[in-house]
């Protein structure tokens, strides 16, 4: 399961953060079906060293009103609003209705939302922060601040909450993004090329796929709400979502990836059978791959994972028991492989099971 994490959304009064990211992403611009809006001189970025911590939240000099609130959907959300905000402008019920109107799953019932003034938010999240999230607690303003609406902040932070409750082994969704979106965005291969930096809330914030996921979720939900204006200010344009990425994001929210799939098959090697058994392996998602093989007694069969070109050997299974062989590997952008079994020693039946993301 994803581990607890902290995120803070803050304002930077310069565009230096994105300068490096724009250069790094130039090679990726051609693949985008849509174009991100131009980034203004005021970019959004994370503030270093100011994560949401329970102690800071508890110590904040803020009086809250509200609590568990049942909305028109029948769902209950725990919303607390600062007394410093006028009741007519920021009621717990209003924000609870907004939250249950977001694209969401069952994770919404685990969330506690604190809506305050900008001063309240910055006393909890940091002096430049517009919002923050950690461990099922979300802090956001109830008023527009520096041209950023509270809805925009809440959508971004709720994206982190979704990732907190999604699984993407062998990685953590909150840093890499949920599985389907991360696969479409080729996060694994980008990390290997030093083009993405999971969990980096500092100088590589704009290339942090966890933040790119949160922004993709925000944009996806804004489109669902009929908002046509597009803003993409805090993450590298190389992560600006295609239609395929938006569809994958929606699926990650509404139909979360749950577990790997295991399939098994067998083949009998005899004196007149083919000397090599090839088995095609489809890998539509990135993640962990395992091959288990049971060979005949007295057999030392070669069980290899081979790339789609039929030539490159990715790895070979090793004995883990008298007749059992195993291979663990990672799928990182490859959409298919082959399992190649070559008999050595005693002939007979070989059983192969594959576990894919």
Question: What residues fall within each predicted segment?
Answer:
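Edge beta-strands of jelly-roll/beta-sandwich modules across compartments, strongly enriched
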Residues: 301, 343-357
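Catalytic Zn2+-binding segment of zinc metalloproteases
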Residues: 158-177, 213, 222-226
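Short pre-active-site segment immediately N-terminal to the catalytic Zn-binding motif
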Residues: 137-155, 202-205
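Metalloprotease/metallohydrolase-associated module, dominated by Zn2+-dependent proteases
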Residues: 181-265
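Auxiliary, metal-adjacent structural segments of Zn-dependent hydrolase domains
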Residues: 73-133
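Non-catalytic extracellular/lumenal accessory regions of secreted precursors
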Residues: 255-288, 296-298, 310, 316-321, ...
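Bacterial N-terminal signal peptides
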Residues: 11-21
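Noncatalytic modules at the cell exterior or secretory-pathway interfaces
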Residues: 286-288, 330-347
